[in-house]
Amino acid sequence: MKPYFLYFLIYTFVLTACKTEIKTSITSSNTDYLDSSEKDDQYLGGIKMIPISTPKGEFNVWTKRVGNNPTMKVLLLHGGPGMTHEIYESFDGYFPNEGIEYYYYDQLGSYYSDQPTDLSLWDLDRFVEEVEQVRVALGLSNDNFYLFGQSWGGILGMQYALKYQENLKGLIISNMVPSIPDYQKYSDEVLAPKLDPDVLKEIMFYEDKEDYTNARYMDL
């Protein structure tokens, strides 16, 4: 029986050694992903305020980097315009496990960024130039730059790609189509019926009057 016991010890040792090696590899990978020693935001939790030039002067927009991957960097474009990056915080449970470096970003007019009151700044082409300035400030290039846009962010992402496709490695669009009439039809026929009828009635009341800044409309 002794030889069998010896074989068991050897087998156990081999399994333990393999398991230890795998753990070491994963730990090393995680260390690289979390290494911010060469980043200029290393003492700021990944946060960077980026100055943006506009026809109405210079303003600052908020960004936050998570992770470190020189070959895959994703800039997240939120909806709105006027929404915030929080919609994407669920990505914290997915992207780090895949080693993806990603950037939260509040567009001009959103919560953590400057909020100028000049409505002429709410222009698609101007937002495209803003994204390009953010890209340059973050050091993203066509070797690693992926743009993710949802809803309004999808429109912005597509418009950016039409002008600056040479700067992109990839474009991901969520919950948006490249046609405003088609999206309006989808909104009227699919999204609107899911709302509470009374809420929808109020929304339509303010939209018919084009009273988009009404406090009640904003609450809805």
Sequence positions of predicted segments:
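C-terminal motif of bacterial Sec signal peptides marking the signal peptidase cleavage site
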Residues: 16-17
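A short loop-to-beta-strand scaffold at the N-terminal edge of the catalytic core in hydrolase folds
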Residues: 56-65
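Short beta-strand element of the alpha/beta-hydrolase
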Residues: 71-80
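The serine-hydrolase catalytic nucleophile loop
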Residues: 82-93
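Conserved alpha/beta-hydrolase
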Residues: 95-114
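Conserved acidic catalytic loop of the alpha/beta-hydrolase fold
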Residues: 125-144
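Conserved hydrolase catalytic core segment
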Residues: 142-186
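A catalytic-pocket lid/entrance helix-loop region that shapes and gates access to the active site
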Residues: 170-213
